[in-house]
């Protein structure tokens, strides 16, 4: 996968040199390039200006971003604008992006964008209902969530298939050594070696956590007969 990032602050992306994303780059599975669009600004390197019609704050000018975009070697990229007014990012969207060969992220700053910048864009995306000072942190979050889904980046595909949201439910509790720590012990079922009972326990705990913490996820989740019975028991025990 090739990722190009248009930003005023390329130095903010140093975390992408480490951990899973960094290893993907070392393996040649991922190429990330940064483009400081200030370097393409014609007007005394000014990238922002006052909005026509008046108003608070400054807007990013169209020319520096267009020229930076035009300079990128690309074929048919998905172009993502980080915008608080965009569609909210989620796991399904990360899985969709992981199928792409080329991504371009445009990171904003200041009050907003000249609207004409959006003619370059295929997707306008937000992390949530809050405002950041720029799009860099949002871009890094999206890149991390996407890159880990690329085949061969994480050793076992099941490692991310069991993650919260990948299945539509929150992830079940997990434990490792020691068995007993300060009186807190690992559930006996996980020590039993009985694979079917472990599967059932994990599914039950996953449903329970989702019901308690993110019941909204269940509104769009297609329950199996087994899951319906488990959820009914969970609700009954809560009453």
Swiss-Prot record:
The record, for Pfam families, names:
tRNA_m1G_MT (PF01746)
Q: Where in the chain are disulfide-linked cysteines found? A: none
Location comes to: Cytoplasm
Q: Which SUPFAM superfamilies match?
A: alpha/beta knot (SSF75217)
EC number(s) per entry: 2.1.1.228
Q: Enzyme group, top EC level?
A: transferase
Where does the secretion signal sit in this chain? none
Q: Which CDD domains match?
A: TrmD-like
> Annotated Gene Ontology MF terms?
tRNA (guanine(37)-N1)-methyltransferase activity
Question: What's its catalytic activity?
Answer: guanosine(37) in tRNA + S-adenosyl-L-methionine = N(1)-methylguanosine(37) in tRNA + S-adenosyl-L-homocysteine + H(+)
**Keywords, sorted A to Z:** Cytoplasm, Methyltransferase, S-adenosyl-L-methionine, Transferase, tRNA processing
Q: Where does S-adenosyl-L-methionine bind?
A: 108, 127-132
The GO biological-process annotations, alphabetized, read as: tRNA N1-guanine methylation
Keyword Cytoplasm annotated: yes
In UniProt terms, what function does this protein have? Specifically methylates guanosine-37 in various tRNAs.
Subunit structure, as described in the record: Homodimer.
- Similarity comment: Belongs to the RNA methyltransferase TrmD family.
User: What name is this protein filed under?
Assistant: tRNA (guanine-N(1)-)-methyltransferase
Q: Which organism is it from?
A: Streptococcus pneumoniae serotype 2 (strain D39 / NCTC 7466)
Q: Which gene encodes it?
A: trmD
């Amino acid at each position: 996968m090739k990722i190009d990032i248009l930003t005023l602050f390329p130095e903010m992306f140093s975390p992408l040199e480490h951990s899973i994303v960094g290893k993907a780059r070392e393996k040649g599975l991922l190429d990330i390039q940064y483009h400081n669009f200030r370097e393409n600004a014609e007007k005394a390197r000014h990238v922002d200006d006052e909005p026509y019609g008046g108003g608070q704050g400054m807007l990013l000018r169209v020319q520096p971003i267009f020229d930076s975009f035009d300079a990128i070697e690309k074929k048919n990229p998905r172009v993502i604008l980080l915008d608080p007014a965009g569609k909210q990012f989620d796991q399904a969207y990360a899985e969709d992006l992981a199928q792409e060969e080329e991504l371009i992220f445009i990171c904003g700053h200041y009050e907003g964008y000249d609207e004409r910048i959006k003619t370059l864009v295929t997707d306008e995306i937000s992390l949530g209902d809050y405002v950041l000072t720029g799009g860099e942190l949002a871009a890094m979050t999206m890149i991390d969530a996407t890159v880990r889904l690329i085949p061969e980046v994480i050793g076992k595909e099941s490692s991310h298939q069991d993650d919260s949201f990948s299945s539509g439910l929150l992830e079940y509790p997990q434990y490792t050594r020691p068995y007993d720590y300060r009186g807190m012990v690992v559930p006996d079922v996980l020590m039993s070696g009985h694979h079917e009972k472990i599967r059932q326990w994990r599914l039950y705990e996953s449903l329970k956590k989702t019901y308690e913490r993110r019941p909204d996820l269940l509104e769009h989740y297609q329950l199996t007969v087994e899951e319906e019975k488990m959820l009914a028991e969970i609700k009954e025990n809560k009453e």
